[in-house]
């Protein structure tokens, strides 16, 4: 967990830029950079949920019945932690899309023939006054996609988290 805390100390986009600069400019390397940046969030939230589930009474009851640790982990802990992981994944997807668009806008995403929203905005900034639609349309599409993923994450949290139900 200390390594995850170390990753939390770096600003996410700077860490992604550093990784892409070391590995080279490509879609795969940008995806790796965003994944490395996202892992600490998953690790911290999953660890917290697992520690919470581990202290539940039914886990102690199952353990007293003689269940093995792998069975407890797979059948009870993972099943109860999965909703949190799914919600984090959908919420994190929105920020990952923004980060990929930012990296490609800065020239650290896919090479120019590959269509990326950030790359489209970067190229269109030269023609902003003549053809504003070239910059507005990719920006609006990024915004709508991010909002949709955030709404999806909110709805999944409402559906999957039993503590929020009245």
Regions from the language model: what does each represent?
Residues 9-17, 79, 83-100, 104, ...:
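Hydrophobic alpha-helical transmembrane segments in multi-pass membrane proteins
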Residues 19-24, 34, 50, 98-141:
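Glycine-rich helix-loop "coupling/hinge" segments at transmembrane-helix boundaries
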Residues 65-67, 107, 111-113, 162-163:
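A short glycine-centered flexible hinge/capping loop motif at secondary-structure junctions
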Residues 1-52, 86:
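Generic hydrophobic transmembrane alpha-helix motif, especially the helices
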Residues 23, 36-37, 83-91, 132-166:
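C-terminal transmembrane helix and the adjacent membrane-cytosol boundary/short C-terminal tail
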Residues 29, 39-50, 54-57, 71, ...:
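Membrane-embedded alpha-helices of multi-pass transport/permease systems
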Residues 1, 51-55, 59-87:
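Amphipathic cytosolic juxtamembrane alpha-helices at the membrane-cytosol interface
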Residues 11, 27-28, 70, 133, ...:
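Residues that define the loop-to-transmembrane-helix transition and helix capping
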